[in-house]
């Protein structure tokens, strides 16, 4: 009678007889911060395909995490360049638009409260070369103007 109770395995008892192990998430197994399980759920729920492989959410989470880290790194640099400690949408826009590859990836994306890149058409700028050439051909200023003469004489 006692032997029948020993053969039965409960939820707390494992095959080896040891205690139950703590569950480890797929994000931890992959060494990621982004949620692999949630991304897998979104892939299934979104009906992008009939079936979703077990490696697909892990790969997608890794790609998304890399892109987020890249954008945040560049936005942090832009914030530091502007002597700010907090990243704002303007810094994100400057980071994305000044990077060639990210700019190409996010070409059709509008970033709210990002503004625009500072850009002045060179045609509209005053011509420095002409000013410098004109100043060189003009007579140098008279020394009388350069030195102050006493007004009382």
Swiss-Prot record:
A motif (SPKK motif) lies at residues 149-152. Residues 132-147 have a biased composition (Low complexity). Its main location: nucleus. Keywords: Chromosome, DNA-binding, Nucleosome core, Nucleus. It is found in: Nucleus; Chromosome. It comes from Euphorbia esula (Leafy spurge). This is Histone H2A. One of its GO terms (cellular component) is nucleus. Belongs to the histone H2A family. The nucleosome is a histone octamer containing two molecules each of H2A, H2B, H3 and H4 assembled in one H3-H4 heterotetramer and two H2A-H2B heterodimers. The octamer wraps approximately 147 bp of DNA. The keyword GTP-binding does not apply. Contains one SPKK motif which may interact with the minor groove of A/T-rich DNA sites. Phosphorylation of this motif may regulate DNA binding. This motif is reiterated in both termini of histone H1 and in the N-terminus of sea urchin histones H2B, but its presence in the C-terminus seems to be unique to plant H2A. CDD domains: HFD_H2A.
